[in-house]
């Protein structure tokens, strides 16, 4: 599963996460003069308000009803608008359920869909989804802006959406479940859940300032009553239909598609230049189908022009169709839109009339389709055109709105995509974005510019063809030249046409012609590809950087040819590559080195209790905890832990479990040992680290060494540097802080190798400080030891004592430490000097006692390395006393230990008074078996662990006369491992 982030609460608009914004751009957002809309100026710029996540937290008594049954929740939601939801608890399954109101496609009645919310440890997720969340609030907040596997996004009640203060939210929250029947809950009864007859005018149901219909090409930011749309380029090309539109009369505005009134037009907005589309595709029979209209303050009407690059950003791919088209998938509505067009120039570009203003009297009734409240907005995508610069706003280049076929002049002048941040600030551009800007670059000269504005907004890199999103054409080597990229993309284009209908092929042909007719964009296109490949180190795959939601993968399939059969594997494959940041870690897992992959496999094997090695590691940790509780010597305790780890490593290196994970040609024997050693650090030392430190602290507190160290630390702190023997500079305050920070991080690390690495960096800082007084002069060990004592006396000596012992005894004895060994022993010597500090016998060299201690340590490492052999590997077995899982003890013994010898260990461990009456039994799935004296318990344990299906077994030490199974029959005496 992949963890998904809820919408950021820091953004002023709330629901949409910020994609990276500079200070200057934020100031421009605050300036309300950028978007000059005379009709509804308050809707232009979103005020800083309350995010969706905050609203959900404050109003949870309204929508989070754990004591409410599913039937009661469905009864409440059936009276609400589409998209309304409640979270209740299924008492039978003991899990949360998300209930969502959904208008039925088969009849006039509405239905309530139920989505179980699964809970595993500290995460929540919808059943069937790969996105996980930390809590219910983040889960609901995410599905309010992105649908994932839902038919549409969730919708909050209008009162909660319009709440602009926490006081209003508190008032709503105090109502609890009674909110749904209160006067604060506006159900919007005037808005139909289903579209009326195709010929019925629906303009009367549109409220220009409050009701807006969203679609997959838009993102709506909502703060209180204010709303702001951003064009989402993700679906600009997805919503395209390769239909040949007839030319529009000159001077007309591209109207909204409506089958009932195809001749209605509306004038263009004042001084709003349009982005010219490429030539339309070949003539074909346009399909028919519904479309959901947008409802800005002044909604125009009329047919919609179409071209391969026309951003039909206001079609509703998720809106359910009328009863006549109920067999059509809900997300393919924009594939079946009629595409008659009027008012286009010779190149498919609209004629501009600066100085004209929108006239609402000329608009025709919009098509009878569901409004915004009838069906929630399509999943939000990445905000590409979020910020607006001063120049681009005055120019008024609302490029995407014109080709969508709907006027936004009374609602918002959309910023051009050229005002987005540079590639260095944002994730790489998607295929749709690059294609959109290519159209801009090719027709830049034909865009009229208002007087006094000579500066044009920068043009982003052009876009690649749609078909290049196929995996075969995107996984290019970073070393390939731009020419090779272009040729491979062209081949992918031709291959992809084979499975398309003639209508789609015509659109693809015109797309290729349009892109080839822009020679000025070619170098820029190649440069953009090269820059993306160089900056990431891998080819820039559009499929990997497209969207935050799996829904975009599903929609891409449904917008393609109807002849292509949609398979779940295809959807999952595309979704895996299009979860940009959610699956960030899994995408780069493919680029992990073979060593890293093997390391992860060994860690998983050690954590798998059902495997033999995993059970061995688990038993070892239990045994170590028991062993540490009775130890009185820190050195012996750490040596025993190190010996056990060495034996575990030796066993795994010679076991068949590791051979099943390793490719012999990729790893040498030395590399395998290092990888297994690192994996054991994580699986063994990490969970035992705190227990080891506690035991060491207790041992040193008992023997008085810790108290002696603390007392002499105060003496050293009161000693001058001259008395310490320091003849060089000492670290300054700033450097001393860095050193103390590194020592703190060293104490937090669990790997001995990581600790030694941090120690080396710390010693380098000390050496650099010593050279400040006399640069260039070399300093030896005699100069370093006094300065090291000076530094350690100002650190946490208790932690340093534990860390030095931890590193010296737990480091792999087969590892050649090099200079790490030198500085480790020097640090150990400095600690011993501080613990036994005497002003009279102060010396700048290690004492004889310390040198002898270091020599003994080096001999121990040599002996431990020689003893690490397969024959000395100890195994572990968990034995319970009298009953299964009661007074369990983990016993260490050799693999060839007989049951009689193990019974003697059990008698000593459980302090049995009459051991001759006790025997060792094994209970397998409720059946009891007695082990013969010559039986080998470890081999029986290994046989049971490897048996299929997995069996539940326990070793029990109890009196022989009680050795009967559940049927009161005497237990069978077993000698061989395969006794079942």
From Swiss-Prot:
<feature type="compositionally biased region" description="Polar residues">
    <location>
        <begin position="406"/>
        <end position="422"/>
    </location>
</feature>
<feature type="compositionally biased region" description="Pro residues">
    <location>
        <begin position="247"/>
        <end position="260"/>
    </location>
</feature>
<keyword id="KW-0963">Cytoplasm</keyword>
<dbReference type="InterPro" id="IPR045046">
    <property type="entry name" value="Vps9-like"/>
</dbReference>
<dbReference type="GO" id="GO:0031267">
    <property type="term" value="F:small GTPase binding"/>
</dbReference>
<dbReference type="GO" id="GO:0031410">
    <property type="term" value="C:cytoplasmic vesicle"/>
</dbReference>
<keyword id="KW-0967">Endosome</keyword>
<feature type="domain" description="SH2">
    <location>
        <begin position="63"/>
        <end position="158"/>
    </location>
</feature>
<feature type="domain" description="Ras-associating">
    <location>
        <begin position="865"/>
        <end position="962"/>
    </location>
</feature>
<feature type="region of interest" description="Disordered">
    <location>
        <begin position="509"/>
        <end position="560"/>
    </location>
</feature>
<feature type="region of interest" description="Disordered">
    <location>
        <begin position="1"/>
        <end position="40"/>
    </location>
</feature>
<dbReference type="GO" id="GO:0005096">
    <property type="term" value="F:GTPase activator activity"/>
</dbReference>
<dbReference type="GO" id="GO:0060755">
    <property type="term" value="P:negative regulation of mast cell chemotaxis"/>
</dbReference>
<dbReference type="GO" id="GO:0005085">
    <property type="term" value="F:guanyl-nucleotide exchange factor activity"/>
</dbReference>
<feature type="compositionally biased region" description="Low complexity">
    <location>
        <begin position="514"/>
        <end position="523"/>
    </location>
</feature>
<feature type="compositionally biased region" description="Pro residues">
    <location>
        <begin position="274"/>
        <end position="308"/>
    </location>
</feature>
<dbReference type="GO" id="GO:0097494">
    <property type="term" value="P:regulation of vesicle size"/>
</dbReference>
<dbReference type="Pfam" id="PF23268">
    <property type="entry name" value="RIN1"/>
</dbReference>
<comment type="similarity">
    <text>Belongs to the RIN (Ras interaction/interference) family.</text>
</comment>
<protein>
    <recommendedName>
        <fullName>Ras and Rab interactor 3</fullName>
    </recommendedName>
</protein>
<dbReference type="GO" id="GO:0030139">
    <property type="term" value="C:endocytic vesicle"/>
</dbReference>
<feature type="domain" description="VPS9">
    <location>
        <begin position="700"/>
        <end position="843"/>
    </location>
</feature>
<feature type="compositionally biased region" description="Polar residues">
    <location>
        <begin position="484"/>
        <end position="494"/>
    </location>
</feature>
<comment type="subunit">
    <text>Interacts with CD2AP, RAB5B, RAB31 and BIN1.</text>
</comment>
<dbReference type="GO" id="GO:0007165">
    <property type="term" value="P:signal transduction"/>
</dbReference>
<feature type="compositionally biased region" description="Low complexity">
    <location>
        <begin position="261"/>
        <end position="271"/>
    </location>
</feature>
<dbReference type="InterPro" id="IPR037191">
    <property type="entry name" value="VPS9_dom_sf"/>
</dbReference>
<keyword id="KW-0968">Cytoplasmic vesicle</keyword>
<feature type="region of interest" description="Disordered">
    <location>
        <begin position="247"/>
        <end position="496"/>
    </location>
</feature>
<dbReference type="InterPro" id="IPR035869">
    <property type="entry name" value="RIN3_SH2"/>
</dbReference>
<dbReference type="GO" id="GO:0016192">
    <property type="term" value="P:vesicle-mediated transport"/>
</dbReference>
<dbReference type="GO" id="GO:0043025">
    <property type="term" value="C:neuronal cell body"/>
</dbReference>
<dbReference type="Pfam" id="PF02204">
    <property type="entry name" value="VPS9"/>
</dbReference>
<dbReference type="GO" id="GO:0002091">
    <property type="term" value="P:negative regulation of receptor internalization"/>
</dbReference>
<dbReference type="GO" id="GO:0005769">
    <property type="term" value="C:early endosome"/>
</dbReference>
<dbReference type="GO" id="GO:0030425">
    <property type="term" value="C:dendrite"/>
</dbReference>
<dbReference type="InterPro" id="IPR003123">
    <property type="entry name" value="VPS9"/>
</dbReference>
<dbReference type="InterPro" id="IPR000159">
    <property type="entry name" value="RA_dom"/>
</dbReference>
<comment type="function">
    <text>Ras effector protein that functions as a guanine nucleotide exchange (GEF) for RAB5B and RAB31, by exchanging bound GDP for free GTP. Required for normal RAB31 function.</text>
</comment>
<dbReference type="Pfam" id="PF00788">
    <property type="entry name" value="RA"/>
</dbReference>
<dbReference type="GO" id="GO:0030424">
    <property type="term" value="C:axon"/>
</dbReference>
<keyword id="KW-0343">GTPase activation</keyword>
């Amino acid at each position: 599963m992949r963890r998904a982030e809820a919408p950021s609460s820091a953004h002023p608009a709330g629901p949409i996460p910020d994609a990276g914004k500079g200070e200057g751009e934020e100031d421009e957002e605050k300036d309300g003069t950028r978007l000059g809309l005379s009709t509804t100026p308050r809707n232009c710029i979103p005020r800083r308000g309350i995010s969706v996540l905050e609203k959900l937290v404050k109003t949870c008594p309204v929508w989070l009803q754990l004591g409410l049954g599913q039937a009661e929740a469905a009864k409440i939601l059936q009276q609400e608008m589409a998209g309304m939801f409640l979270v209740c608890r299924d008492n039978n399954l003991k899990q949360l359920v998300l209930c969502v109101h959904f208008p039925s496609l088969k009849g006039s009645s509405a239905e309530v869909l139920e989505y179980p919310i699964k809970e595993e440890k500290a995460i929540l997720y919808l059943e069937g989804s790969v996105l996980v969340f930390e809590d219910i609030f983040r889960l609901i907040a995410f599905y309010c802006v992105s649908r994932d596997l839902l038919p549409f996004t969730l919708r909050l009640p209008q009162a909660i959406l319009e709440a602009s203060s926490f006081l209003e939210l508190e008032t709503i929250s105090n109502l609890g479940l009674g909110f749904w029947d209160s006067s604060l809950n506006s159900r919007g009864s005037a808005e139909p859940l289903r579209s009326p007859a195709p010929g019925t005018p629906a303009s009367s149901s549109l409220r220009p300032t409050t009701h807006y219909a969203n679609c997959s090409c838009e993102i709506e930011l909502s703060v209180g009553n204010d709303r702001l749309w951003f064009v989402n380029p993700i679906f600009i090309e997805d919503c395209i239909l390769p239909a040949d539109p007839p030319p529009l009369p000159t001077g007309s505005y591209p109207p909204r598609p409506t089958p009932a009134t195809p001749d209605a037009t509306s004038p263009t907005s004042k001084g709003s230049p349009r982005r010219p589309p490429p030539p339309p595709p070949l003539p074909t029979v346009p399909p028919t189908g519904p479309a959901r209209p947008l409802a800005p303050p002044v909604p125009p009407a009329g047919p919609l022009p179409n071209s391969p690059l026309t951003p039909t950003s206001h079609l509703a791919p998720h809106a359910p169709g009328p009863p006549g088209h109920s067999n059509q998938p809900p997300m393919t509505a924009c594939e079946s839109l009629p595409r008659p067009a009027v008012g286009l120039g010779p190149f498919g570009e609209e004629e501009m009339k600066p100085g004209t203003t929108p006239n609402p009297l000329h608009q025709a009734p919009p098509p009878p389709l569901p409004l915004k409240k009838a069906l929630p907005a399509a999943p939000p995508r990445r905000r590409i055109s979020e910020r607006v610069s001063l120049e681009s706003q005055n120019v008024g280049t609302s490029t995407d709105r014109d080709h969508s076929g709907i006027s936004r002049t009374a609602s918002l002048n959309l910023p051009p995509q050229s005002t987005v941040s540079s590639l260095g600030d944002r994730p790489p551009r998607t295929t749709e974005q690059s294609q959109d800007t290519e159209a801009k670059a090719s027709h830049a000269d034909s865009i009229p510019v208002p007087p006094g504005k000579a500066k044009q907004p920068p043009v982003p890199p052009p876009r690649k063809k749609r078909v290049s999103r196929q995996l075969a054409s995107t996984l290019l080597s970073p070393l390939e030249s731009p020419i090779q990229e272009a040729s491979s993309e062209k081949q992918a284009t031709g291959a992809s046409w084979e499975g398309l209908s003639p209508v789609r092929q015509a659109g693809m042909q015109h797309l290729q012609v349009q892109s080839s007719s822009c020679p000025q964009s070619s170098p820029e296109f190649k440069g953009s590809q090269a820059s993306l490949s160089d900056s990431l180190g891998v080819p820039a795959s559009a499929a990997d950087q497209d969207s935050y939601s799996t829904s975009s993968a599903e929609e891409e399939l449904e917008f393609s040819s109807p002849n292509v059969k949609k398979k779940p594997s295809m959807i999952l494959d595309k979704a895996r590559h299009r979860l940009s940041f959610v699956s960030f870690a899994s995408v780069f897992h493919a680029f992990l080195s073979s060593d890293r992959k093997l390391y992860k496999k060994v860690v998983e094997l050690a954590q798998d209790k059902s495997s033999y090695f995993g059970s061995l590691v688990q038993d070892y940790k239990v045994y170590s905890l028991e062993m540490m509780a009775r130890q009185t010597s820190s050195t012996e305790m750490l040596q025993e832990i190190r010996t056990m780890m060495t034996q575990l490593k030796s066993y795994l290196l010679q076991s068949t479990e590791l051979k099943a994970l390793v490719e012999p040609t990729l790893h040498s024997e030395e590399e395998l040992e290092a990888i297994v050693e690192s994996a054991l650090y994580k699986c063994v030392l990490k969970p035992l680290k705190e227990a080891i430190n506690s035991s060491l602290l207790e041992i040193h507190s008992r023997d008085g060494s810790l108290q002696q160290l603390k007392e002499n630390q105060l003496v050293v702190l009161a000693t001058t540097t001259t008395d310490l023997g320091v003849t060089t500079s000492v670290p300054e305050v700033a450097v001393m802080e860095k050193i103390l920070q590194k020592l703190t991080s060293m104490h937090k690390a669990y790997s001995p190798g990581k600790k030694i690495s941090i120690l080396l960096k710390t010693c380098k800082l000390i050496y650099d400080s010593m050279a400040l007084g006399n640069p260039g002069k070399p300093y030896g060990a005699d100069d370093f030891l006094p300065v090291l004592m000076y530094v350690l006396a100002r650190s946490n000596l208790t932690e340093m004592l534990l860390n030095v012992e931890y590193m010296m005894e737990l480091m792999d004895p087969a590892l050649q430490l090099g200079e790490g060994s030198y500085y480790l022993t020097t640090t150990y010597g400095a600690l011993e000097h501080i613990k036994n500090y005497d002003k009279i016998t102060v010396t700048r060299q290690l004492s004889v006692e310390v040198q002898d201690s270091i020599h003994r340590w080096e001999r121990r490492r040599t002996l431990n390395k020689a003893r690490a052999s397969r024959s000395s590997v100890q195994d572990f077995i968990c034995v319970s006393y009298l009953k299964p899982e009661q007074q369990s003890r983990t016993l260490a013994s050799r693999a060839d230990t007989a049951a009689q010898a193990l019974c003697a260990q059990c008698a000593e461990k459980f302090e049995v008074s009459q051991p001759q009456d006790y025997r060792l039994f094994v209970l397998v799935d409720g059946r009891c078996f007695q082990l013969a004296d010559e039986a080998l318990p470890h081999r029986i344990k290994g046989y049971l662990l490897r048996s299929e299906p997995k069996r539940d077994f326990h070793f029990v030490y109890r009196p022989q006369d009680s050795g009967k199974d559940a049927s009161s029959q005497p237990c069978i005496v077993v000698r061989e491992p395969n006794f079942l």
